[in-house]
Protein backbone atom coordinates (compact mmCIF):
# COMPACT_ATOMS: atom_id res chain seq x y z
CA UNK A 1 0.00 0.00 0.00
CA UNK A 2 1.28 3.45 -0.90
CA UNK A 3 1.98 5.80 1.99
CA UNK A 4 -0.12 8.87 2.62
CA UNK A 5 3.01 10.97 2.77
CA UNK A 6 4.02 9.95 -0.74
CA UNK A 7 0.58 10.68 -2.10
CA UNK A 8 -0.51 13.81 -0.32
CA UNK A 9 2.43 16.01 0.55
CA UNK A 10 3.57 16.73 -3.01
CA UNK A 11 2.79 19.85 -4.99
CA UNK A 12 0.86 17.80 -7.50
CA UNK A 13 -0.62 19.95 -10.30
CA UNK A 14 -3.11 17.26 -11.28
CA UNK A 15 -6.80 17.99 -10.67
CA UNK A 16 -9.23 16.57 -8.20
CA UNK A 17 -11.67 14.62 -10.37
CA UNK A 18 -15.23 14.01 -9.19
CA UNK A 19 -17.35 11.42 -10.97
CA UNK A 20 -21.08 11.97 -10.60
CA UNK A 21 -22.98 15.18 -9.98
CA UNK A 22 -25.53 13.95 -7.47
CA UNK A 23 -25.63 15.12 -3.88
CA UNK A 24 -22.33 13.56 -2.83
CA UNK A 25 -20.40 14.59 -5.94
CA UNK A 26 -21.82 18.08 -6.43
CA UNK A 27 -21.44 19.10 -2.81
CA UNK A 28 -17.95 17.61 -2.61
CA UNK A 29 -17.07 19.89 -5.53
CA UNK A 30 -18.69 22.98 -4.03
CA UNK A 31 -17.10 22.47 -0.62
CA UNK A 32 -13.72 21.79 -2.21
CA UNK A 33 -13.94 25.05 -4.10
CA UNK A 34 -14.20 26.86 -0.77
CA UNK A 35 -11.23 24.94 0.63
CA UNK A 36 -8.88 24.40 -2.29
CA UNK A 37 -7.61 26.68 -5.06
CA UNK A 38 -6.33 23.94 -7.36
CA UNK A 39 -8.12 22.48 -10.39
CA UNK A 40 -11.38 20.60 -9.80
CA UNK A 41 -13.22 18.68 -12.52
CA UNK A 42 -16.80 17.44 -12.14
CA UNK A 43 -17.94 14.84 -14.68
CA UNK A 44 -21.56 13.81 -15.20
CA UNK A 45 -23.48 12.25 -18.07
CA UNK A 46 -26.32 14.76 -17.77
CA UNK A 47 -26.46 18.52 -18.27
CA UNK A 48 -28.54 18.97 -15.14
CA UNK A 49 -28.52 18.11 -11.47
CA UNK A 50 -31.61 16.15 -10.37
CA UNK A 51 -33.07 16.69 -6.92
CA UNK A 52 -34.66 13.24 -6.71
CA UNK A 53 -36.56 13.65 -3.40
CA UNK A 54 -38.75 16.32 -5.00
CA UNK A 55 -39.60 14.51 -8.24
CA UNK A 56 -43.03 13.79 -6.74
CA UNK A 57 -43.62 17.52 -6.40
CA UNK A 58 -42.60 17.96 -10.02
CA UNK A 59 -45.18 15.37 -11.06
CA UNK A 60 -47.92 17.16 -9.12
CA UNK A 61 -46.75 20.63 -10.27
CA UNK A 62 -46.09 21.65 -6.66
CA UNK A 63 -42.62 22.77 -7.82
CA UNK A 64 -41.19 23.70 -11.21
CA UNK A 65 -38.52 21.85 -13.18
CA UNK A 66 -35.96 24.65 -12.97
CA UNK A 67 -36.09 24.50 -9.18
CA UNK A 68 -35.18 20.84 -8.82
CA UNK A 69 -33.14 20.29 -11.98
CA UNK A 70 -30.78 23.24 -12.50
CA UNK A 71 -28.07 22.99 -15.14
CA UNK A 72 -24.54 22.32 -13.95
CA UNK A 73 -23.12 25.16 -16.03
CA UNK A 74 -25.44 27.54 -14.19
CA UNK A 75 -24.71 26.03 -10.78
CA UNK A 76 -20.96 26.20 -11.32
CA UNK A 77 -20.82 29.54 -13.12
CA UNK A 78 -17.79 31.54 -11.94
CA UNK A 79 -16.94 28.84 -9.40
CA UNK A 80 -13.70 27.79 -11.04
CA UNK A 81 -14.96 24.20 -11.17
CA UNK A 82 -14.72 22.65 -14.63
CA UNK A 83 -17.83 20.74 -15.67
CA UNK A 84 -17.42 17.97 -18.24
CA UNK A 85 -20.45 16.38 -19.88
CA UNK A 86 -19.51 12.76 -20.47
CA UNK A 87 -20.02 9.12 -19.62
CA UNK A 88 -17.32 7.34 -17.66
CA UNK A 89 -16.11 4.23 -19.44
CA UNK A 90 -13.29 3.01 -17.21
CA UNK A 91 -11.15 3.92 -14.21
CA UNK A 92 -7.55 2.78 -13.81
CA UNK A 93 -6.91 3.01 -10.09
CA UNK A 94 -3.25 2.05 -10.40
CA UNK A 95 -2.48 4.63 -13.09
CA UNK A 96 -4.85 7.15 -11.50
CA UNK A 97 -6.70 7.87 -14.72
CA UNK A 98 -10.35 8.17 -15.79
CA UNK A 99 -11.44 7.42 -19.36
CA UNK A 100 -14.69 8.66 -20.92
CA UNK A 101 -16.52 6.95 -23.77
CA UNK A 102 -15.66 9.97 -25.90
CA UNK A 103 -12.01 8.97 -25.65
CA UNK A 104 -11.09 11.80 -23.30
CA UNK A 105 -8.79 10.85 -20.44
CA UNK A 106 -8.24 12.62 -17.13
CA UNK A 107 -5.41 11.89 -14.73
CA UNK A 108 -6.15 12.82 -11.16
CA UNK A 109 -4.52 13.68 -7.87
CA UNK A 110 -7.57 12.69 -5.89
CA UNK A 111 -10.67 10.94 -7.15
CA UNK A 112 -14.22 11.08 -5.79
CA UNK A 113 -16.54 8.25 -6.79
CA UNK A 114 -20.16 9.42 -6.58
CA UNK A 115 -21.77 7.68 -9.53
CA UNK A 116 -24.86 6.62 -7.62
CA UNK A 117 -26.85 3.55 -8.54
CA UNK A 118 -28.83 2.32 -11.52
CA UNK A 119 -32.17 0.55 -11.80
CA UNK A 120 -32.11 -3.21 -11.42
CA UNK A 121 -35.06 -5.10 -12.86
CA UNK A 122 -34.04 -8.20 -10.91
CA UNK A 123 -34.12 -10.38 -14.01
CA UNK A 124 -37.92 -10.19 -14.21
CA UNK A 125 -39.10 -10.75 -17.80
CA UNK A 126 -40.68 -7.68 -19.35
CA UNK A 127 -39.94 -5.34 -16.45
CA UNK A 128 -37.48 -3.14 -18.31
CA UNK A 129 -39.66 -3.02 -21.41
CA UNK A 130 -43.08 -2.48 -19.86
CA UNK A 131 -42.59 -0.78 -16.48
CA UNK A 132 -42.02 2.95 -16.01
CA UNK A 133 -39.12 4.13 -13.87
CA UNK A 134 -38.99 7.30 -11.76
CA UNK A 135 -35.45 8.59 -11.40
CA UNK A 136 -35.13 11.65 -13.65
CA UNK A 137 -37.05 14.68 -14.81
CA UNK A 138 -37.64 12.89 -18.10
CA UNK A 139 -39.17 9.96 -16.21
CA UNK A 140 -41.55 12.36 -14.47
CA UNK A 141 -42.84 13.83 -17.71
CA UNK A 142 -43.05 10.41 -19.37
CA UNK A 143 -45.11 9.04 -16.48
CA UNK A 144 -47.37 12.09 -16.39
CA UNK A 145 -48.03 11.96 -20.13
CA UNK A 146 -48.65 8.21 -19.98
CA UNK A 147 -51.15 8.55 -17.13
CA UNK A 148 -53.04 11.44 -18.71
CA UNK A 149 -53.33 9.46 -21.93
CA UNK A 150 -54.73 6.42 -20.11
CA UNK A 151 -57.28 8.55 -18.26
CA UNK A 152 -58.47 10.14 -21.49
CA UNK A 153 -58.84 6.79 -23.23
CA UNK A 154 -60.75 5.46 -20.22
CA UNK A 155 -63.41 8.15 -20.66
CA UNK A 156 -63.96 7.09 -24.26
CA UNK A 157 -64.10 3.30 -24.01
CA UNK A 158 -67.35 1.39 -23.55
CA UNK A 159 -65.58 -1.82 -22.53
CA UNK A 160 -65.79 -2.19 -18.74
CA UNK A 161 -62.76 -4.49 -18.42
CA UNK A 162 -60.65 -2.26 -20.64
CA UNK A 163 -61.62 0.80 -18.60
CA UNK A 164 -60.76 -1.00 -15.36
CA UNK A 165 -57.28 -1.84 -16.69
CA UNK A 166 -56.75 1.70 -17.99
CA UNK A 167 -57.56 3.08 -14.55
CA UNK A 168 -55.35 0.62 -12.66
CA UNK A 169 -51.83 1.55 -11.60
CA UNK A 170 -49.57 -1.22 -10.28
CA UNK A 171 -46.59 -0.07 -8.23
CA UNK A 172 -43.87 -2.68 -7.86
CA UNK A 173 -42.14 -2.29 -4.52
CA UNK A 174 -43.39 -1.33 -1.07
CA UNK A 175 -40.37 0.61 0.10
CA UNK A 176 -40.31 4.36 0.66
CA UNK A 177 -40.34 5.15 -3.08
CA UNK A 178 -43.30 2.89 -3.74
CA UNK A 179 -45.32 4.25 -0.84
CA UNK A 180 -44.58 7.87 -1.76
CA UNK A 181 -45.53 7.18 -5.37
CA UNK A 182 -48.78 5.47 -4.40
CA UNK A 183 -49.81 8.25 -2.01
CA UNK A 184 -48.99 10.93 -4.55
CA UNK A 185 -50.91 9.29 -7.40
CA UNK A 186 -53.88 8.55 -5.13
CA UNK A 187 -54.37 12.29 -4.67
CA UNK A 188 -53.18 13.44 -8.10
CA UNK A 189 -55.06 11.19 -10.53
CA UNK A 190 -58.54 12.27 -9.38
CA UNK A 191 -57.61 15.91 -10.07
CA UNK A 192 -56.86 14.90 -13.65
CA UNK A 193 -59.75 12.48 -14.11
CA UNK A 194 -62.68 14.46 -12.68
CA UNK A 195 -62.36 17.33 -15.22
CA UNK A 196 -62.60 14.68 -17.96
CA UNK A 197 -65.96 13.62 -16.57
CA UNK A 198 -64.61 10.49 -14.89
CA UNK A 199 -65.50 8.98 -11.53
CA UNK A 200 -62.39 8.98 -9.30
CA UNK A 201 -63.69 5.94 -7.41
CA UNK A 202 -63.00 3.90 -10.55
CA UNK A 203 -59.27 4.51 -10.17
CA UNK A 204 -57.32 1.65 -8.61
CA UNK A 205 -53.79 1.93 -7.22
CA UNK A 206 -52.09 -1.23 -5.99
CA UNK A 207 -48.71 -1.76 -4.33
CA UNK A 208 -47.15 -5.16 -4.98
CA UNK A 209 -44.75 -5.95 -2.15
CA UNK A 210 -42.72 -9.15 -2.05
CA UNK A 211 -42.21 -8.97 1.71
CA UNK A 212 -44.62 -9.31 4.59
CA UNK A 213 -44.92 -5.56 5.25
CA UNK A 214 -44.26 -2.24 3.58
CA UNK A 215 -41.39 0.06 4.57
CA UNK A 216 -39.75 -2.83 6.35
CA UNK A 217 -36.20 -1.48 6.46
CA UNK A 218 -36.59 2.24 5.92
CA UNK A 219 -38.78 3.55 8.74
CA UNK A 220 -39.79 3.10 12.35
CA UNK A 221 -42.88 1.13 13.36
CA UNK A 222 -44.69 4.38 14.15
CA UNK A 223 -44.01 5.95 10.77
CA UNK A 224 -44.93 2.69 9.06
CA UNK A 225 -48.29 2.72 10.82
CA UNK A 226 -48.81 6.36 9.84
CA UNK A 227 -48.03 5.55 6.21
CA UNK A 228 -50.43 2.60 6.18
CA UNK A 229 -53.20 4.79 7.58
CA UNK A 230 -52.49 7.63 5.15
CA UNK A 231 -52.63 5.27 2.17
CA UNK A 232 -56.18 4.40 3.14
CA UNK A 233 -57.18 8.03 3.65
CA UNK A 234 -56.10 9.37 0.28
CA UNK A 235 -58.64 10.55 -2.29
CA UNK A 236 -58.30 7.08 -3.80
CA UNK A 237 -57.63 4.33 -1.27
CA UNK A 238 -54.43 2.44 -2.04
CA UNK A 239 -54.46 -1.35 -2.09
CA UNK A 240 -51.46 -3.26 -0.77
CA UNK A 241 -50.75 -6.86 -1.78
CA UNK A 242 -48.16 -8.32 0.59
CA UNK A 243 -46.03 -11.40 -0.05
CA UNK A 244 -46.72 -10.90 -3.73
CA UNK A 245 -43.68 -11.57 -5.88
CA UNK A 246 -43.78 -10.20 -9.41
CA UNK A 247 -42.80 -12.88 -11.91
CA UNK A 248 -43.32 -11.13 -15.24
CA UNK A 249 -44.69 -7.94 -16.75
CA UNK A 250 -46.51 -8.00 -20.06
CA UNK A 251 -48.18 -5.12 -21.91
CA UNK A 252 -51.12 -4.28 -19.66
CA UNK A 253 -50.65 -7.23 -17.29
CA UNK A 254 -48.56 -7.98 -14.20
CA UNK A 255 -48.03 -11.62 -13.22
CA UNK A 256 -47.24 -12.25 -9.57
CA UNK A 257 -47.14 -15.17 -7.17
CA UNK A 258 -49.03 -15.05 -3.88
CA UNK A 259 -49.60 -17.93 -1.48
CA UNK A 260 -48.12 -20.29 -4.03
CA UNK A 261 -50.61 -19.28 -6.71
CA UNK A 262 -49.84 -17.37 -9.90
CA UNK A 263 -52.14 -14.36 -10.30
CA UNK A 264 -52.59 -11.69 -12.96
CA UNK A 265 -53.41 -8.03 -12.49
CA UNK A 266 -54.62 -6.07 -15.50
CA UNK A 267 -52.92 -2.68 -15.27
CA UNK A 268 -52.24 -0.26 -18.10
CA UNK A 269 -49.63 1.47 -15.94
CA UNK A 270 -46.84 -0.28 -14.05
CA UNK A 271 -44.38 1.84 -12.07
CA UNK A 272 -41.09 0.25 -11.00
CA UNK A 273 -39.82 1.53 -7.63
CA UNK A 274 -37.68 -1.35 -6.41
CA UNK A 275 -34.27 -2.75 -7.25
CA UNK A 276 -31.03 -0.78 -7.26
CA UNK A 277 -27.76 -1.91 -8.80
CA UNK A 278 -24.29 -0.45 -8.55
CA UNK A 279 -23.08 1.57 -11.50
CA UNK A 280 -21.39 -0.58 -14.18
CA UNK A 281 -18.16 1.38 -13.81
CA UNK A 282 -18.14 0.67 -10.08
CA UNK A 283 -18.73 -3.00 -10.87
CA UNK A 284 -15.72 -3.03 -13.19
CA UNK A 285 -13.26 -1.51 -10.72
CA UNK A 286 -10.28 -3.65 -9.80
CA UNK A 287 -11.40 -3.94 -6.19
CA UNK A 288 -10.96 -7.10 -4.14
CA UNK A 289 -14.23 -8.93 -3.38
CA UNK A 290 -13.65 -8.54 0.35
CA UNK A 291 -13.80 -4.78 -0.16
CA UNK A 292 -17.37 -4.94 -1.48
CA UNK A 293 -20.65 -5.77 0.23
CA UNK A 294 -23.18 -8.32 -1.02
CA UNK A 295 -24.71 -5.67 -3.29
CA UNK A 296 -21.28 -4.95 -4.83
CA UNK A 297 -21.09 -1.53 -3.21
CA UNK A 298 -17.62 -0.32 -2.28
CA UNK A 299 -16.63 -0.72 1.35
CA UNK A 300 -14.98 2.46 2.58
CA UNK A 301 -13.14 3.48 5.70
CA UNK A 302 -14.80 5.80 8.23
CA UNK A 303 -12.95 8.57 6.36
CA UNK A 304 -14.78 7.47 3.16
CA UNK A 305 -11.50 6.38 1.52
CA UNK A 306 -11.03 3.12 -0.36
CA UNK A 307 -8.91 0.78 1.80
CA UNK A 308 -6.20 0.16 -0.82
CA UNK A 309 -6.36 3.53 -2.55
CA UNK A 310 -6.26 6.35 0.02
CA UNK A 311 -6.37 9.02 -2.69
CA UNK A 312 -9.80 7.73 -3.76
CA UNK A 313 -12.98 8.60 -1.87
CA UNK A 314 -16.49 7.26 -2.40
CA UNK A 315 -19.90 8.43 -1.20
CA UNK A 316 -23.58 8.21 -1.93
CA UNK A 317 -25.30 5.08 -3.22
CA UNK A 318 -22.16 3.40 -4.59
CA UNK A 319 -20.41 3.03 -1.23
CA UNK A 320 -21.04 1.97 2.34
CA UNK A 321 -19.08 2.26 5.56
CA UNK A 322 -19.53 -1.19 7.16
CA UNK A 323 -19.02 -0.09 10.76
CA UNK A 324 -21.54 2.74 10.47
CA UNK A 325 -23.90 2.11 7.55
CA UNK A 326 -26.15 4.99 6.58
CA UNK A 327 -29.36 5.07 4.52
CA UNK A 328 -29.06 6.04 0.87
CA UNK A 329 -30.70 9.45 1.24
CA UNK A 330 -30.02 13.02 0.15
CA UNK A 331 -29.33 14.02 3.76
CA UNK A 332 -26.53 11.46 4.01
CA UNK A 333 -24.98 12.08 0.58
CA UNK A 334 -24.91 15.84 1.13
CA UNK A 335 -22.96 15.45 4.38
CA UNK A 336 -20.66 12.84 2.87
CA UNK A 337 -19.77 15.26 0.09
CA UNK A 338 -18.74 17.87 2.65
CA UNK A 339 -16.75 15.30 4.65
CA UNK A 340 -14.92 14.12 1.54
CA UNK A 341 -13.98 17.70 0.65
CA UNK A 342 -12.54 18.36 4.10
CA UNK A 343 -10.59 15.10 4.09
CA UNK A 344 -9.10 15.77 0.67
CA UNK A 345 -8.02 19.19 1.91
CA UNK A 346 -6.47 17.53 4.97
CA UNK A 347 -4.45 15.16 2.78
CA UNK A 348 -3.28 18.00 0.56
CA UNK A 349 -2.05 19.79 3.70
CA UNK A 350 -0.23 16.68 4.89
CA UNK A 351 -2.70 16.02 7.70
CA UNK A 352 -4.64 12.90 8.59
CA UNK A 353 -8.24 12.60 7.41
CA UNK A 354 -10.97 12.30 10.03
CA UNK A 355 -14.01 9.99 10.17
CA UNK A 356 -17.06 11.38 8.43
CA UNK A 357 -19.92 12.29 10.73
CA UNK A 358 -23.52 12.20 9.54
CA UNK A 359 -26.28 13.82 11.56
CA UNK A 360 -29.73 12.73 10.48
CA UNK A 361 -32.55 15.10 11.25
CA UNK A 362 -35.07 12.36 10.76
CA UNK A 363 -37.16 10.60 8.16
CA UNK A 364 -39.03 12.62 5.57
CA UNK A 365 -41.83 10.96 3.60
CA UNK A 366 -44.32 12.39 1.14
CA UNK A 367 -47.77 10.95 1.79
CA UNK A 368 -50.00 12.74 -0.69
CA UNK A 369 -50.35 16.09 -2.40
CA UNK A 370 -49.31 18.89 -0.05
CA UNK A 371 -48.87 16.39 2.79
CA UNK A 372 -45.92 14.59 4.35
CA UNK A 373 -44.93 12.79 7.50
CA UNK A 374 -41.73 13.83 9.22
CA UNK A 375 -40.17 11.86 12.05
CA UNK A 376 -37.60 13.99 13.85
CA UNK A 377 -34.77 12.55 15.93
CA UNK A 378 -36.67 9.21 15.80
CA UNK A 379 -38.87 10.60 18.59
CA UNK A 380 -41.41 13.07 17.24
CA UNK A 381 -43.75 12.81 14.30
CA UNK A 382 -45.27 15.73 12.43
CA UNK A 383 -47.61 15.07 9.53
CA UNK A 384 -50.01 16.74 7.17
CA UNK A 385 -49.37 20.16 5.65
CA UNK A 386 -47.00 21.14 8.45
CA UNK A 387 -45.00 18.00 7.77
CA UNK A 388 -44.85 18.94 4.10
CA UNK A 389 -43.63 22.44 4.94
CA UNK A 390 -40.82 21.00 7.05
CA UNK A 391 -39.95 18.45 4.38
CA UNK A 392 -39.76 21.07 1.64
CA UNK A 393 -37.75 23.52 3.72
CA UNK A 394 -35.34 20.78 4.79
CA UNK A 395 -34.73 19.65 1.23
CA UNK A 396 -34.61 23.10 -0.33
CA UNK A 397 -32.04 24.11 2.25
CA UNK A 398 -29.66 21.72 0.48
CA UNK A 399 -30.17 23.29 -2.93
CA UNK A 400 -27.28 25.40 -4.29
CA UNK A 401 -29.77 27.42 -6.36
CA UNK A 402 -32.26 30.28 -6.06
CA UNK A 403 -34.24 27.88 -3.88
CA UNK A 404 -32.12 29.32 -1.12
CA UNK A 405 -34.21 32.46 -1.43
CA UNK A 406 -37.14 30.35 -0.28
CA UNK A 407 -35.08 28.88 2.52
CA UNK A 408 -34.06 32.31 3.70
CA UNK A 409 -37.74 32.95 4.33
CA UNK A 410 -38.72 29.53 5.68
CA UNK A 411 -35.50 27.97 6.97
CA UNK A 412 -35.85 29.79 10.29
CA UNK A 413 -39.23 28.10 10.63
CA UNK A 414 -37.80 24.61 10.23
CA UNK A 415 -34.81 25.28 12.46
CA UNK A 416 -36.95 26.81 15.20
CA UNK A 417 -39.31 23.82 15.19
CA UNK A 418 -36.35 21.44 15.44
CA UNK A 419 -34.88 23.43 18.31
CA UNK A 420 -38.18 23.53 20.19
CA UNK A 421 -38.69 19.79 19.80
CA UNK A 422 -35.12 19.08 20.90
CA UNK A 423 -35.83 20.87 24.18
CA UNK A 424 -38.82 18.67 25.01
Where does each model-flagged region fall?
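Short glycine-enriched, charge-decorated loop/helix-capping segments at active-site entrances
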Residues: 55-63, 128-132, 222, 286-289, ...
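FAD-site-proximal beta/loop scaffold in flavoenzymes
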Residues: 129-159, 252-253, 263-335
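C-terminal, flexible cofactor-proximal segment of oxidoreductases
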Residues: 2-4, 332, 336-424
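Hydrophobic/aromatic beta-strand patches that form the interior of the parallel beta-sheet core
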Residues: 41-43, 84, 112, 132, ...
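Beta1-alpha1 glycine-rich phosphate/pyrophosphate-binding loop at the start
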Residues: 2-82, 169, 176-218, 271
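Short glycine-rich anion-binding loops that position phosphate/pyrophosphate groups of nucleotides
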Residues: 24, 116-119, 182, 276-278
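A Rossmann-like FAD-binding core segment of flavoenzymes
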Residues: 79, 83-90, 186-302, 353
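FAD-binding core/adjacent interface of flavoenzyme oxidoreductases
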Residues: 1-13, 81-168, 260, 271
Amino acid sequence: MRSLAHIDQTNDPLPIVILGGGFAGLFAALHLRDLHSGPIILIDQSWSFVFKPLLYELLTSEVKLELISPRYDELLHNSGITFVLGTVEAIDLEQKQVKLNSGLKYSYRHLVLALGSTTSYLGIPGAKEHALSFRTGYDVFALGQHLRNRLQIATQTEDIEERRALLTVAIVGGGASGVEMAATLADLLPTWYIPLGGNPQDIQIVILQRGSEILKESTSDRLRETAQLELQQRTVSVGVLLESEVKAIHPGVVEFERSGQLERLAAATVVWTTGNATHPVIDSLAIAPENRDKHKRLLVKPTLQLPDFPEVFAGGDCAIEPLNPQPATAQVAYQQGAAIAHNIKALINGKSPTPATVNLRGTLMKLGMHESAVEIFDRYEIKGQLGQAIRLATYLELMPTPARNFVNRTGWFTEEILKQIARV
